[in-house]
UniProtKB/Swiss-Prot annotation:
This is Orotate phosphoribosyltransferase. Keywords: Glycosyltransferase, Magnesium, Pyrimidine biosynthesis, Transferase. It catalyses: orotidine 5'-phosphate + diphosphate = orotate + 5-phospho-alpha-D-ribose 1-diphosphate. Orotate binds at residues 34-35, 128, 156.
Length: 214
């Protein structure tokens, strides 16, 4: 695990974004951990988050001409990632986001920011059903741009109703690559090394065994 991935987990724990216990998910599954990226809610949190996303983009050599943040959670992520790329990597990347409702005055339309052209990277927090990401992919297609990847904070590596995860279904349906700052396997590695949190390891491993993708 890289230093920034460890730092991301530590920030998530400090902000209660990542918690351990028993949590009933929308799917009805009882998960031994819960991740709520909405609790990254200060300027410092966003600044660090942008650095983590930017580093993940760089490490995976993802071609990127425009960052796209799906409304609403993806908007601050796209913004802070763009800032981190220029401040820490000298990459001045435009960003764009969509409105939930079209605007019929002023500049109008459903998109705000840069035009969607070239290689577009979608940035969001996590994928559950993947609805917002699929909508974003259709928007990119309508503008004749190319989807070069999707960037997330956490990949739960968890099956949906079938044998694939929501991420794997997106990769299959849109022939795209999904990247994440950390995966559940990274979290398991962190727990294995942690003196204070290792008690949660058996439950997380059992959950991975039961619901995890191969």
């Amino acid at each position: 695990m890289k230093a920034y991935q460890r730092h991301f987990i530590e920030l998530a724990l400090a902000k209660n974004v990542l918690k351990f216990g028993e949590f009933t998910l929308k799917s009805g599954r009882v998960s031994p951990y819960f991740f709520n990226a909405g609790l990254f809610n200060t300027g410092r949190d966003l600044a660090l988050l942008g650095q983590f996303y930017a580093q993940t983009l760089i490490d995976n050599h993802v071609p990127c001409d425009v960052l796209f943040g799906p409304a609403y959670k993806g908007i601050p992520i796209a913004t802070t990632t763009a800032v981190a790329l220029v401040e820490h990597h000298d990459m001045d990347v435009p960003y764009c986001f969509n409105r939930k409702e079209a605007k019929d005055h002023g500049e109008g339309g459903t998109l705000v920011g840069s035009p969607l052209t070239g290689n577009v990277v979608i940035v969001d927090d996590v994928i559950t059903a993947g609805t917002a990401i699929r909508e974003s992919m259709e928007i990119i297609k309508q503008h004749d741009a190319t989807l070069s990847g999707v960037l997330l904070s956490l990949d739960r590596q968890e099956k949906g109703r079938g044998s694939l995860s929501a991420i794997q279904e997106l990769e299959r349906d849109y022939q795209c690559q999904v990247y994440s700052i950390i995966t559940l396997d990274d979290l398991i590695s962190y727990l294995t090394e942690s003196e204070t949190l290792s008690a949660h390891l058996p439950a997380v491993k059992a959950y991975r065994e039961r619901y995890g993708i191969n």
